[in-house]
């Protein structure tokens, strides 16, 4: 699944988790926002990141600026991975919500009960000296 497919997958998962007015933004000129959606009365600007490594501070900053551009009440970064300490600190200070691999897994399980198995992310073993 490439990044574009991941955005559409996340949009469907959000719909199945009770979000309404879920829209995938156009690829260019999206101001870092991949999905806009509402949960109750709260409108969200959401950036999706399909990464192998940790998601950094830049994604949080882009979600925050995209929130302002789209006039949303909240911003979130949704990833199949985890976040760096710097990203967590910035999110805490700015109010951007961080939805990591564990949150995404829970949302997928709720969206597709009993249908999908998601493997645990394997941690790389440190290289041993010869």
Regions found by a protein language model. Give the residues of each.
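Mixed-charge (Asp/Glu-Lys/Arg
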Residues: 1-130
